[in-house]
Amino acid sequence: MDHDVAVRTTVASPTAVVAQATTWQEFPRLWGSLLDEVYAFVRAGGTTQTGHNVMLYRDDVPNVEVGVQVAGPFAASGRVIPSELPATRVASTVHRGPYDGLTAAHDAVHAWCAEHGHVLTRTRWEIYGDWREDPDELETEISWELAAPA
């Protein structure tokens, strides 16, 4: 699949998340339980979901935040905390298709940035579009923060 990559400026988007330091080997087994914690909090009236599921990776450890886009600030409860997707310049693409193709989309952003002289930070995130029963119809927005020009 081809991934069109573009540079854009994002606006901050409030989120309700569980933050966790993990490993890349553990993360595929972990993210579902983290998201379940957030949804239990939202269903209990802790905040109002206004957007999609998100995964924010702050670095390569990875230190991750798994959660949902929400209306605004709220009081933390247990491991669910307020956070946000940052307002920043990013290189982004939309992956259309099954989630097992997300690595190719991330690789496409890296390749495009290398070709066009952009330097990436380690901060990146995925915004998962509306659920579709057909995996070929899934859409996931991938954004990588760009380093400030030297």
Regions found by a protein language model. Name each.
Residues 1-150:
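A solvent-exposed interaction/effector surface
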